[in-house]
Amino acid sequence: GGSIPVVTIDYVHYSCSAVSSNNVKCMGELLDYIISMGHKKIAYIHGQDFSSVTRDRLAAYYRALENHGIDIPEEYVREARYLETEDVAKQTEYLLDLPDKPTCIIYPDDTAAIGGINVIRSRGLRIPEAISIAGYDGTRVSQMLSPKLTTIRQDTDKIGREAADRLISIIKKPKTALVERAVVEGILLER
């Protein structure tokens, strides 16, 4: 005894139960949609923390491109800290300065996408005419933008309920508690 019951959300640790979005499936669906819209030059600014979330999304990005027979230059894959608009702005500038610019940029979260939009618009480029963008989170703010942001909406209510249920179960029946992983599906919001 004496250990504190823990359930993590969107972070996998070997000794704790975890509840997370289906990052692999959702990123695959997002890329399938972007590719179906005619894009082949797709950049991805990913989180810098190398958590399981970052690794899963990055692997799914590469896997989806491979499944579609698309090769992208290594410089299309950039790092920026999650929710860090200044980092994202620098990486967006870098991508826009490339001689062979991407036609679509995927951001690690919707807040980052908003930072990217500001950089793109400051250059006089129109979205989606000059360049397309996509986010990941499905925040309310991202759906108030014009044009609305293509993104993956994470079912945060379901993730929270699932985590709470697992935590209550661990507290009530510690002797039968197992380290489990639960995955909650996200929803592609096409715009």
Task: Please give the residue ranges for each predicted region.
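Bacterial carbohydrate/catabolite-sensing allosteric modules
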Residues: 2-191
